[in-house]
Every structure is written in C-alpha cells, then in structure tokens.
Amino acid sequence: MIEAAHRALDAGATRYTSVAGIEPLRAAIAADASRRRAAPIDASNVVVSAGTKQALFNACFALFAAGDEVLVPTPGWTSYYEMLTIARATAVPVTGPRERSFKISRAELERARTERTRGLILNSPSNPTGAVYSRSELEEIVAVAEEAGWWILSDEIYRGICYVGEATSLLSVAPSSGGGRLVIVDGLAKSMAMPGWRIGWSIGPVSLARSMAALQSHTTSNATTISQHAALSALSDTDAYRSALAEMMKELRRRRDGALGILREGGLEVLEPEGAFYLFVRAGQATSDNPEPGNRLAEHLLDSHDVAVVAGSAFRAPEWIRVSFAAPTADVLEGVRRIAAAGIS
C-alpha cells in the first residue's frame, strides 16, 4: 500500500477526484461486496469517504430529519448518538440482556419502536462489546425492519476481525427486494490496519449514493487522492491481504486470550469478544453514591496505575470500561495485569 501511494505520487495523483471516489476503487469495492450478495452491486452504489465515520455521518444526514427516531444497540459506539443528534434526529438506545453480550433481538426492537422510528444502526462485530450477530439473529432483525419500512445502517468496519468464523454481512442477509433500505459502511482502518489513511465507504441505493456524494461535496469533497490509490492496491491484491489479515488475527487472538485469562483470574467480569479488539470489563454496580463506576475506575487506573481505558459511559454503559488489545502484546498484557491488580473498589 505504501508502494502504491509512492507510485501514485510519482504519477502526479495529487489533484481532485470525483467526490464519490476514483472509478477503479469504487468498482473494486463493488466487486468485493458482490461476492457477499446474490444481487449485483456496481460502482454507482459506492461513495468513498474520509473514513467510515464520514460515511455514517453522510448517511445520517441524508436519511433522517428532525423528529425521526433511530434505534441504536447499546452499549454502542459513542459517535452514533452524536451524529444523529447533529442530524437533528433522536437516537433511541436499545439494549439486549447481558448474558447475550447485550445483543438485541425482535423483542427489544418491538419494545423500543414508535410511530416515529425511521431507522436502525447495527454494528457487528460490535464496538465496544465484541459481540457478533449470527445469520439467524440478523435475519430476525432484518425481518422487523422490513416489516416496519426502516432504514438499516450496518457498520461493518470490524467485519474482517472475527474469532468465530466469518462475520456475516447484512449484504448476504437482506433480501434483494429490501436492499433499497440498506446502507453498508466499511473501510480500511481496522482489518487492513490503515486508520491514518482515512478511507471508508458506503454501499447503498444509487439515489442515496448521489445524495450522500452531494452532501460530501460541501464538506470535504473527495477522500485523499493518494489514499484512494493505496486502498485500490489493498483491495486488488486479495492474496496479500488475506495473508496479512491471517497473521494479524493470530496475534490478536493471542492477545485476547491472554488478556481475558488475566482479567478473569483477577476476579473481574469480562465479556468474551467474538470480534473486534476490545474487552468489555464490568467496573461495578451503579449506586446513588457512585452512579458511573466505569468513570471512577477509568480515572483510578489512569491516575494510579498509568493505564488508559475508555469509561463505559461513552457507550451508554456506565458500569463498564473498554480495554483495547490493539496495542503491542507486551503492553496489553502488562496493562491488564495492572487492571487485575487494581481490582474493583
């Protein structure tokens, strides 16, 4: 990818591109997506953006308006709530049982829906819990959305990082007849370890893709030209990508298993992640004196043990903390040893 970026620079690829991205990259994204879905996808369905975050932001602004409610599985990535707020829509948290790693089902959706519900955001594998939805679980959720006429925004940025086989994409679940209300967002930041290159994309109906590109034309215009060429190289050399991902997954699995063992031996409650690279750790029971134990523990770990974690309140889960194991193995294991030694007060 770095060599591809050098070649692009040498060739003078420093000008604007189409707002939606260079045609070869969009075609490569469409071809990859088509392998996961019976119905064909082409470049006109794809908008390349400055990371998956921008793709989600574009979708929220293009689809939702003041008064619209969007269901958000909770605990969930903090930016979902903020993006919807900026778009003047209302984020409605939906939470499944702890025993199911908080995954939602038809029952939770039916309880949360109102006549103002217009959409649903899904994230599998999940940040922060690492939960992965099975095909049957996704089929149940899609059925509810189809019946209600909701849009589904499926954030699949962690799809390549799964410890229980291959994570199911909604592209392979949603029927082609209902694909018109499905937006997939993905990118290179996680499974290709390219967060700084700022390349993400959305896949959706052509009319929506045009609206999202029009919106993007007034914010950032095209994603960085050089990064687009690097991304094309990454998506084109599938053998090299699979080999690199397999090596990365071996290391991530070692970190996950080692860190999980240390924390559980220390008596901490930890959700076992099936995907992504986070451990969700229980920080204690919320009380009137300590309504956000995750915040208190995160501050204590940073101030007294030089360990940085994310307080669960960022994900609407104040009794938890999120521990990343994306850092070097030695740092991860030392960090979780300190967390285990600190315990829960």
Predicted segment positions?
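N-terminal small-domain helix-loop-helix segment of the aminotransferase-like
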Residues: M1-G51, N58, E108, D237, ...
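Conserved core segment of the aminotransferase class I/II
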Residues: A4, P175-K250, I344
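Short acidic capping loops at alpha-helix termini that bridge into adjacent secondary structure
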Residues: P40-V46, G67-E69, R116, G179-L182
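Conserved PLP-anchoring active-site segment centered on the Schiff-base-forming lysine
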Residues: A62-L84
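A short helix-loop-beta submotif of the ANL/AMP-binding
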Residues: I86-A91
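Active-site phosphate-binding strand-loop segment of PLP-dependent enzymes
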Residues: V92, G96-L171
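Conserved glycine-rich beta-strand-loop-beta hairpin in the small C-terminal domain of fold type I
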Residues: L232, A246-L260, V270-G284, E319
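PLP-dependent enzyme catalytic core of the Aspartate aminotransferase-like
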Residues: N290-V309, S313-S345
